[in-house]
Amino acid sequence: MSNICVASSKLNLPTLLRSVFRSEFTAELRPQQEPKSLFLTRPTLFTYRRVRDGRHFSSLTRSLEFQSRSPVSSHSSLLVATDVCSTPQPSESVKLSNDQVSVSHATDSTGAISTRQSANNKKGSGTRATPDLMATESDSSKTSRSQGPRVSALSSLAKSNKKRETWQIQKDALKKKFKEGWNPPKKLSPDALDGIRHLHSVAPDRFTASVLAEQFQVSPEAIRRILKSKWRPSAEEMEERRERWDRRHDRIWSQMTELGLRPKSRRANQYSDAKVLYDDSGKQE
């Protein structure tokens, strides 16, 4: 039993219809092909007909072009139909292509596995072939580690044996005495200094450095230095120092009066901000 090609059966119907319509169309156009010969013999008549029947001439040229192209298209359609009939089924081709792809993947995977195995073998052979190098490297690292602490210990000993400067010794002593940090010393008046010395000379067991430090709100080290010092100012220096402290007292008193914490006084009035900004008449300077 003969096999029927589905593609050829689908393509035969339009080709037959095209051939039928083409034959009818060419039969109608055959008597109208005379102007083509008149173009060479009678140019005046051709120009007259072209002006009169311009649309008819354009349709004629289009029909001629269609007629020249149609045999080529019909021939190509017939060739396509024959090719479709002669080719195998698509399912078989897909199966073959899938089989080829699977075979190629299998070969690629086996090749990759073989390359990995060869690389591992090379690595293993390299590591086995060079145990001496590994041993030497480990020995060198051990020696460097053992020598490191020795070098640091020697450097620390050299630094400790080196003679220290006086300012370094004093700095370390101050750090030990002032563990909470170095704070600026509190300014004590000459009367306070004299009072500290007098109290300590009268009752040294009762007025110790720690007690005096709590009383005058300074560090015990500052009290020890005050008691230890043997320097005494002269009469002129004492008078100058006393005047300076009196001015400081009046200035602080004027600031307290502006805040409302102290009563007004004539001595502190000259240090007030109002006295600095305005004169006695109340005008701004």
Curated annotation (Swiss-Prot):
Record keywords: Mitochondrion, Transit peptide
GO cellular component: mitochondrion; nucleus
Superkingdom of this protein's organism: Eukaryota
Compartment(s) where it occurs, according to its Swiss-Prot or TrEMBL record: Mitochondrion
Primary subcellular site in the record, as a coarse category: mitochondrion
General function of this protein: Required for respiratory activity and maintenance and expression of the mitochondrial genome.
Name of the protein described by the UniProt record: Required for respiratory growth protein 9, mitochondrial
Gene: rrg9
